[in-house]
Amino acid sequence: MVTGTDERLERFRAEFLPKLVTAFRPTVVMAFGSRIRGEGLAHSDLDLVIVSDSFRNIRWLDRPGCVIEALGLKFGVDLFCYTPEEYARKREEFGVVRTACQEGVPLITEPST
C-alpha cells in the first residue's frame, strides 16, 4: 500500500501537470482511485479525470493516447478525458466521474487562463 504522500501523484503535479495545462488547457483535472484513497500498491496506476475543450475534435477512445503522447508519460495512468459538456452529464450519472467528484483530489478546478 502507498502511504503518506503519493510519489506518483506528486511527480505528475510537478512534472506533467504544467505540460498538460500548456497542451490541453484543462478546466478540471481530478486525481482519484486507490492511490488517493491510500490503498494503492507500488504498481498501481494513477487515475485522472481531465476536462478540456481541446478534446472536442478527438474521438473519446483516442483522447488518453493523445494526452500520454503529448506529455511523454512514462508511468501507468488511467485517463478519463471529457469535454465540458460530457463532464457535466457524467457528473450526474453513476460511474467513474461521479466517484472521482466524491473522492478525488482536485489538481485544477477552474478555467485555465
Where are these regions (language model features)?
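Catalytic core of pol beta-like nucleotidyltransferases
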Residues: M1-V28, I36-H43, S52-T113
